[in-house]
């Protein structure tokens, strides 16, 4: 092979090697970039934008209704999982309260029971599972309402979930009251009602 040809091949190889090194270096820089993105953040962002779009297009009330359907189904699934894990066909009131706290803990919420009796369970929450994504997206609170309502009603017969305070609307903590009986007090508050087996 002529020397000129060898020189051309050598130059071409060095050029390709330089491109490869540059591409590898660029890829490393991109992979190590401090971009606040992972699967959890992506999914929470997706839910936030979906909720926001629904609120803008159909209004807050209807958006909450659509999200309620999703929350109801998730609530049923979670209820079945806990019943199976605890090997019981039905949860007691105390178990319902602990299950609701535990399920929120598992998704990085920080709910705790303030008080409970035969009429209601009162919860507070210091951290929303959706994080900052829930800000100004009150329809996303329907996930909590429906999951809590579905589990409470399926095990105890009835529930009315009252969202007294929510982080979504600017409160420092959430306050959620799950009414377990239809009383004058529960009928006087704004909330969503849930009944055992109503959707089956």
Predicted regions and their residues:
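N-terminal accessory segment detector
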Residues: 2-122, 127-143, 153-200
């Amino acid at each position: 092979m002529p020397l000129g040809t060898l020189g051309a091949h050598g130059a071409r190889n060095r050029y390709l090697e330089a491109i490869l090194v540059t591409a590898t270096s660029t890829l490393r820089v991109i992979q190590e970039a401090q971009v606040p993105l992972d699967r959890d953040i992506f999914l929470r962002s997706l839910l936030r934008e979906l909720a926001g779009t629904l609120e803008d297009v159909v209004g807050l009330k209807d958006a909450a209704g659509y999200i309620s359907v999703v929350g109801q189904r998730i609530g049923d699934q979670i209820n079945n999982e806990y019943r199976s894990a605890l090997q019981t066909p039905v949860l007691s009131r105390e178990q319902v309260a602990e299950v609701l706290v535990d399920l929120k803990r598992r998704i990085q919420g920080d709910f705790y029971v303030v008080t409970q009796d035969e009429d209601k369970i009162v919860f507070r929450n210091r951290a929303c599972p959706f994080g900052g994504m829930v800000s100004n997206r009150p329809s996303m609170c329907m996930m909590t309402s429906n999951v809590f309502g579905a589990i409470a009603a399926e095990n105890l017969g009835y529930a009315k979930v009252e969202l007294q305070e929510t982080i979504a609307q600017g409160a420092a903590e959430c306050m959620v009251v799950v009414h377990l009986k239809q009383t004058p007090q529960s009928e006087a508050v704004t909330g969503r009602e849930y009944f055992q087996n109503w959707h089956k």
